[in-house]
């Protein structure tokens, strides 16, 4: 597009910031903490915790369940977590591909266990596979987590 539309090169500038587990941003209003999750073969992969004015949110990122995620989500106000239904992968992929996908994502049942073990106040499910099974996700999570669960959608506010 730059050749035909003559956009300035500055708009395409990418500045890479390498980070490690720990505080990645802090000011008088918010602290953002990155923590390692397991999304192998992607290494490193991070989840993030946001603490502001006595409230907290954790975003899991793509991950399988890990103790490190549970540790960083302990007692948070909101946990935003990906979830999948195992039978979906079984129905649309080869057994090998399905096994790989299940290895580095978190099933709805596992998300319920993570939320329970972390003692989160509100669980928001996101990055859902498949996207059209809201009640099934709620039922699976609810076997383990008795707190409030919301199936997320774009532009939701809390």
Please provide the spans of the model-predicted regions:
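Cap/insert and terminal regions of metallo-dependent hydrolase folds
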Residues: 46-47, 53-58, 64-156
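Binuclear metal-dependent hydrolase catalytic cores
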Residues: 1-58, 138-158
